Curated annotation (Swiss-Prot):
SMART domains (alphabetical): 7TM_GPCR_Srsx
Tissues expressing the protein: Mainly expressed in neurons of the olfactory epithelium. Also expressed in the intestine.
GO molecular function: trace-amine receptor activity
GO cellular component annotations of the record: plasma membrane
Entries under InterPro entries matching the protein: GPCR_Rhodpsn, GPCR_Rhodpsn_7TM, TAAR, TAAR1, TAAR_fam
GO biological process: adenylate cyclase-activating G protein-coupled receptor signaling pathway; G protein-coupled receptor signaling pathway
Lineage: Eukaryota, Metazoa, Chordata, Craniata, Vertebrata
Official protein name in the record: Trace amine-associated receptor 9
Membrane topology qualifier: Multi-pass membrane protein
Subcellular location: Cell membrane
UniProt key word Disulfide bond: yes
Protein function: Olfactory receptor specific for trace amines, such as triethylamine, N-methylpiperidine, N,N-dimethylcyclohexylamine (DMCHA), beta-phenylethylamine (beta-PEA), cadaverine (CAD) and polyamines such as spermidine. Trace amine compounds are enriched in animal body fluids and act on trace amine-associated receptors (TAARs) to elicit both intraspecific and interspecific innate behaviors. Trace amine-binding causes a conformation change that triggers signaling via G(s)-class of G alpha proteins (GNAL or GNAS).
Location of region: Extracellular Loop 2 (ECL2): 164-177
Amino acid sequence: MELCYENVNGSCIKSSYSPWPRAILYAVLGLGALLAVFGNLLVITAILHFKQLHTPTNFLVASLACADFLVGVTVMPFSTVRSVEGCWYFGDTYCKFHTCFDTSFCFASLFHLCCISIDRYVAVTDPLTYPTKFTISVSGVCIALSWFFSVTYSFSIFYTGANEEGIEELVVALTCVGGCQAPLNQNWVLLCFLLFFLPTVVMVFLYGRIFLVAKQQARKIEGSANQPQASSESYKERVARRERKAAKTLGIAMAAFLVSWLPYIIDAVIDAYMNFITPAYVYEILVWCVYYNSAMNPLIYAFFYPWFRKAIKLIVSGKVFRADSSRTNLFSEEAGAG
């Protein structure tokens, strides 16, 4: 039996993986961190550099990418070592910060997705007046509130140790030298569940409404297309089609987030009421499903957004350093804006 810290009383037990499984785990988990960092960096760079992408929705997407980027930089590399080795080698202080960063950035992602669902609902249901309702200023307020609430919640619980109130004996029993755990007591886990559940209900309801409206609009356009005078698509129809496409892509991003998060949240609630009975390997799988979500959004954008693929080519090829590259037209006529 190998310990995290030899010759130290109360040391955690180190994982007993043989070399090949250990190398595979490092490769798989490390790949997730690299995708989260460089994929989201591409999203941020594209939106901030190309003036055509300076829209309220895209600023929300850029801030969401920033949260996922920070997960890839400050959380995933350290969690990779902890998950593979079974040990925390980065000190008690950074253990607290790691937990705070983890929770802050993940909840920031959730709140951003909720704001994006509101933005898409307004855009699809009322595309012509949308630009006057959801402005860049409104987007900025949404971004500020998303970051404020997520950071305040996380640091007020985990940095102060409030998460351990009432379960001190259990925490002592679970604690060993070389570990980094942050169990939530029953009160805080319920708040955590509500912070996840309420935005989720809002998102599911709004995207449900979006797709109902989109279906009605599609039928209306099909009906008007059969009329002789409808030889060309009207401006309103083009705008509606563009907004539906954006809503569909961002709806997929929301669905991916919920699928990644839901098992972890359910397990966290069960654990708090069952004295943390979840086996370590199950917990690690659930945590990494959440982490890997930070790498998924750039892949979703690359698959569904032609403008993002074009932006990637310009960034990777270095053409963004050319004069006036920020004014490059990323959209084809038929694609419309993202």
